[in-house]
Swiss-Prot record:
Subunit structure, interactors included: Part of the 50S ribosomal subunit.
Annotated source species: Helicobacter pylori (strain Shi470)
Protein name in UniProt: Large ribosomal subunit protein uL4
Listed GO CC annotations: ribonucleoprotein complex; ribosome
Ranges of compositional bias, category Gly residues: 56-71
Amino acid sequence: MSKAIVLDSHLKEKGSVELPKRYEGINSHNLYLYVKHYLSSARANTAKSKNRAEVSGGGRKPWAQKGGGRARAGSITSPVFVGGGVSHGATNNRNYNLKINKKQKRLALEYALEEKAQANKLFVVEKIAIKGVVEDNKRKHLTKEANQMFQALEQRDTLFVCMNMDEYTELAFSNLKKCLIIDVSELNAYLLAAFSSVVMEEAAFQHVVQDKTEE
Protein backbone atom coordinates (compact mmCIF):
# COMPACT_ATOMS: atom_id res chain seq x y z
CA MET A 1 0.00 0.00 0.00
CA SER A 2 1.32 3.44 -0.96
CA LYS A 3 2.35 5.87 1.75
CA ALA A 4 2.82 9.62 2.01
CA ILE A 5 5.96 10.81 3.78
CA VAL A 6 5.30 12.80 6.97
CA LEU A 7 7.74 15.68 7.62
CA ASP A 8 8.47 17.51 10.86
CA SER A 9 8.72 21.29 11.32
CA HIS A 10 12.29 21.19 9.91
CA LEU A 11 11.07 19.28 6.83
CA LYS A 12 12.87 16.11 7.88
CA GLU A 13 11.17 12.74 7.52
CA LYS A 14 9.59 11.52 10.74
CA GLY A 15 7.13 8.88 9.58
CA SER A 16 4.53 7.98 6.99
CA VAL A 17 0.79 7.74 6.51
CA GLU A 18 -0.98 5.23 4.29
CA LEU A 19 -3.31 6.15 1.49
CA PRO A 20 -6.74 4.46 1.58
CA LYS A 21 -6.95 1.04 -0.02
CA ARG A 22 -9.38 2.30 -2.66
CA TYR A 23 -6.49 4.22 -4.26
CA GLU A 24 -4.99 0.97 -5.53
CA GLY A 25 -5.65 -0.35 -9.02
CA ILE A 26 -7.20 2.79 -10.52
CA ASN A 27 -7.04 2.93 -14.30
CA SER A 28 -4.60 5.57 -15.58
CA HIS A 29 -7.05 6.37 -18.39
CA ASN A 30 -9.02 8.48 -15.90
CA LEU A 31 -6.05 10.83 -15.55
CA TYR A 32 -5.70 11.02 -19.33
CA LEU A 33 -9.36 11.98 -19.68
CA TYR A 34 -9.09 14.64 -16.98
CA VAL A 35 -5.97 16.23 -18.49
CA LYS A 36 -7.74 16.45 -21.87
CA HIS A 37 -10.77 17.98 -20.15
CA TYR A 38 -8.63 20.49 -18.22
CA LEU A 39 -6.60 21.65 -21.22
CA SER A 40 -9.58 21.85 -23.57
CA SER A 41 -11.52 23.91 -21.02
CA ALA A 42 -8.62 26.36 -20.81
CA ARG A 43 -8.40 26.74 -24.59
CA ALA A 44 -9.21 30.26 -25.74
CA ASN A 45 -11.65 30.23 -28.63
CA THR A 46 -10.30 33.31 -30.42
CA ALA A 47 -9.61 32.05 -33.96
CA LYS A 48 -11.96 33.80 -36.38
CA SER A 49 -12.00 34.39 -40.14
CA LYS A 50 -14.52 36.42 -42.13
CA ASN A 51 -16.79 34.76 -44.65
CA ARG A 52 -18.01 36.47 -47.83
CA ALA A 53 -20.90 38.10 -45.98
CA GLU A 54 -18.59 39.74 -43.43
CA VAL A 55 -15.78 41.23 -45.55
CA SER A 56 -16.17 44.81 -46.75
CA GLY A 57 -16.90 45.72 -50.35
CA GLY A 58 -18.69 43.74 -53.02
CA GLY A 59 -21.56 46.15 -53.54
CA ARG A 60 -21.33 46.08 -57.30
CA LYS A 61 -20.54 43.58 -60.00
CA PRO A 62 -16.77 43.84 -60.75
CA TRP A 63 -17.22 43.57 -64.52
CA ALA A 64 -19.85 42.85 -67.12
CA GLN A 65 -21.28 39.37 -67.28
CA LYS A 66 -20.43 38.91 -70.96
CA GLY A 67 -18.07 40.24 -73.59
CA GLY A 68 -14.89 40.67 -71.58
CA GLY A 69 -13.42 37.23 -72.12
CA ARG A 70 -13.11 36.66 -68.39
CA ALA A 71 -14.98 34.31 -66.14
CA ARG A 72 -18.20 35.76 -64.80
CA ALA A 73 -18.04 37.27 -61.33
CA GLY A 74 -20.74 38.74 -59.14
CA SER A 75 -18.81 40.17 -56.18
CA ILE A 76 -15.24 40.78 -55.05
CA THR A 77 -16.15 39.24 -51.69
CA SER A 78 -16.12 35.82 -53.33
CA PRO A 79 -13.48 33.44 -51.87
CA VAL A 80 -11.82 33.22 -55.30
CA PHE A 81 -10.65 36.85 -55.01
CA VAL A 82 -7.68 38.01 -52.93
CA GLY A 83 -9.18 39.83 -49.97
CA GLY A 84 -12.46 38.02 -50.34
CA GLY A 85 -14.19 35.89 -47.73
CA VAL A 86 -12.74 32.64 -46.43
CA SER A 87 -14.49 29.37 -47.14
CA HIS A 88 -14.82 26.94 -44.23
CA GLY A 89 -12.63 29.16 -42.04
CA ALA A 90 -12.32 29.26 -38.28
CA THR A 91 -15.28 30.51 -36.26
CA ASN A 92 -15.28 31.70 -32.66
CA ASN A 93 -18.51 29.96 -31.70
CA ARG A 94 -16.93 26.53 -31.27
CA ASN A 95 -16.96 24.94 -27.82
CA TYR A 96 -13.77 22.95 -27.18
CA ASN A 97 -14.79 21.80 -23.70
CA LEU A 98 -14.79 18.03 -23.20
CA LYS A 99 -17.21 16.67 -20.64
CA ILE A 100 -16.11 14.43 -17.79
CA ASN A 101 -18.24 13.14 -14.93
CA LYS A 102 -17.64 13.55 -11.19
CA LYS A 103 -16.54 9.96 -10.69
CA GLN A 104 -13.86 10.23 -13.37
CA LYS A 105 -12.60 13.48 -11.80
CA ARG A 106 -12.34 11.78 -8.41
CA LEU A 107 -10.60 8.71 -9.84
CA ALA A 108 -8.13 10.91 -11.75
CA LEU A 109 -7.25 12.79 -8.55
CA GLU A 110 -6.84 9.56 -6.59
CA TYR A 111 -4.67 8.02 -9.32
CA ALA A 112 -2.42 11.11 -9.44
CA LEU A 113 -1.99 11.04 -5.64
CA GLU A 114 -1.21 7.33 -5.75
CA GLU A 115 1.45 7.91 -8.40
CA LYS A 116 3.11 10.60 -6.29
CA ALA A 117 3.05 8.37 -3.22
CA GLN A 118 4.58 5.43 -5.10
CA ALA A 119 7.38 7.71 -6.32
CA ASN A 120 7.99 8.97 -2.74
CA LYS A 121 7.07 12.49 -3.87
CA LEU A 122 4.01 13.02 -1.68
CA PHE A 123 4.78 14.81 1.59
CA VAL A 124 2.57 15.78 4.53
CA VAL A 125 3.40 18.56 7.00
CA GLU A 126 1.43 19.86 9.94
CA LYS A 127 1.24 23.44 8.66
CA ILE A 128 2.47 25.55 5.74
CA ALA A 129 2.73 29.10 7.05
CA ILE A 130 5.09 31.93 6.10
CA LYS A 131 5.18 34.85 8.52
CA GLY A 132 8.33 36.74 7.52
CA VAL A 133 9.85 39.49 9.67
CA VAL A 134 7.97 42.59 10.83
CA GLU A 135 9.95 45.77 10.12
CA ASP A 136 8.47 49.28 10.13
CA ASN A 137 4.99 47.80 10.54
CA LYS A 138 5.48 45.75 7.37
CA ARG A 139 6.09 42.06 6.85
CA LYS A 140 9.32 41.46 4.97
CA HIS A 141 11.48 38.55 3.77
CA LEU A 142 8.40 36.48 2.94
CA THR A 143 9.78 35.14 -0.33
CA LYS A 144 13.15 34.42 1.28
CA GLU A 145 11.50 32.28 3.94
CA ALA A 146 9.38 30.48 1.33
CA ASN A 147 12.46 29.81 -0.81
CA GLN A 148 14.31 28.36 2.18
CA MET A 149 11.39 26.00 2.72
CA PHE A 150 11.46 24.94 -0.93
CA GLN A 151 15.25 24.45 -0.93
CA ALA A 152 15.03 22.28 2.20
CA LEU A 153 12.80 19.84 0.32
CA GLU A 154 15.50 19.29 -2.34
CA GLN A 155 12.92 18.79 -5.08
CA ARG A 156 12.91 19.98 -8.69
CA ASP A 157 9.53 21.69 -8.38
CA THR A 158 6.80 21.51 -5.78
CA LEU A 159 3.07 21.99 -5.42
CA PHE A 160 2.08 23.18 -1.94
CA VAL A 161 -1.49 22.50 -0.84
CA CYS A 162 -2.93 24.40 2.13
CA MET A 163 -6.12 24.28 4.13
CA ASN A 164 -7.45 27.83 4.46
CA MET A 165 -4.33 29.56 3.12
CA ASP A 166 -3.51 33.01 4.50
CA GLU A 167 -2.51 36.00 2.36
CA TYR A 168 1.11 36.18 3.57
CA THR A 169 1.79 32.56 2.67
CA GLU A 170 0.23 33.02 -0.76
CA LEU A 171 2.26 36.19 -1.33
CA ALA A 172 5.49 34.52 -0.21
CA PHE A 173 5.34 31.78 -2.85
CA SER A 174 4.03 33.98 -5.67
CA ASN A 175 7.53 35.00 -6.84
CA LEU A 176 9.04 31.50 -6.84
CA LYS A 177 9.16 30.05 -10.35
CA LYS A 178 9.35 26.39 -9.41
CA CYS A 179 6.63 26.48 -6.76
CA LEU A 180 2.90 26.89 -6.72
CA ILE A 181 0.81 27.19 -3.59
CA ILE A 182 -2.94 26.61 -3.71
CA ASP A 183 -5.86 26.08 -1.39
CA VAL A 184 -7.13 22.52 -1.19
CA SER A 185 -10.33 23.64 -2.94
CA GLU A 186 -8.24 24.35 -6.08
CA LEU A 187 -6.50 20.97 -6.13
CA ASN A 188 -7.00 18.87 -9.24
CA ALA A 189 -5.40 15.92 -11.02
CA TYR A 190 -3.71 18.10 -13.66
CA LEU A 191 -1.75 20.09 -11.08
CA LEU A 192 -0.75 16.90 -9.27
CA ALA A 193 0.58 15.46 -12.53
CA ALA A 194 2.29 18.71 -13.57
CA PHE A 195 4.58 18.97 -10.52
CA SER A 196 7.27 16.47 -9.59
CA SER A 197 6.49 16.65 -5.85
CA VAL A 198 3.56 17.64 -3.65
CA VAL A 199 3.54 18.98 -0.09
CA MET A 200 0.19 18.98 1.69
CA GLU A 201 -0.88 20.26 5.04
CA GLU A 202 -2.15 17.49 7.28
CA ALA A 203 -5.67 18.94 7.34
CA ALA A 204 -5.67 19.27 3.54
CA PHE A 205 -4.43 15.70 3.13
CA GLN A 206 -7.18 14.34 5.38
CA HIS A 207 -9.75 16.40 3.51
CA VAL A 208 -8.65 14.98 0.15
CA VAL A 209 -8.38 11.30 1.13
CA GLN A 210 -11.69 11.10 2.98
CA ASP A 211 -14.17 8.80 1.23
CA LYS A 212 -16.23 10.83 -1.24
CA THR A 213 -17.82 7.88 -3.04
CA GLU A 214 -21.13 8.54 -1.29
CA GLU A 215 -21.30 12.17 -2.41
